[in-house]
């Protein structure tokens, strides 16, 4: 009888030791639900860049500019994911400022003084986005890294993006920040909102309100009307709330460092 009891105790101890952290399975399932949103947004960016290539071939500068702007939306919504999971592709696709390739190299050609000959850069951008979309079918969407991505992007929107904008030549820096904020809201809602609400309803309400404030800060008609100080404060508050929430849902506090797990 004692042997059975000791065996049972040992089995119970091992089960507790080897089991996933509380909330790990629901978070993993929520991250999987987010995958399709990423595929859709990167697919939209890819479709936009293919339209851009068609307009360049037709020597349609106005159409090419419009396609470039449209392609940015899906990309910017996905930045919760891109820099932390695929940093090399992120640099090929969206390095800034003063990039000679990717979105911003093409921006300099279309909206700057270099004319319409951006076909080589556009071919490369199509290839990189197609590569990324293919990888999205199987890449491991670790919830910790996605939480890091939300915190990092929120901090960036309130920091260097607010300090002058990312897409200055095209005049669409505000569009970038709006899409970033929408991407943050989407990722938080799909992946983390339910888990935080279960762990701490009061904290969940505060985090959701902080996400909404970030979106409201950039839903303005013109970048000149941006209250940069308020945006910075609101972005930092959101990061702080995410850091408070993380251990309550079985994760480490999110880090702002690139390449963190």
How would you name each of these model-derived features?
Residues 20-24:
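Sec/Tat signal peptide C-region and signal peptidase I cleavage site
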Residues 25-261:
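Mature extracytoplasmic or organellar-lumen-exposed domains after removal of signal/transit peptides
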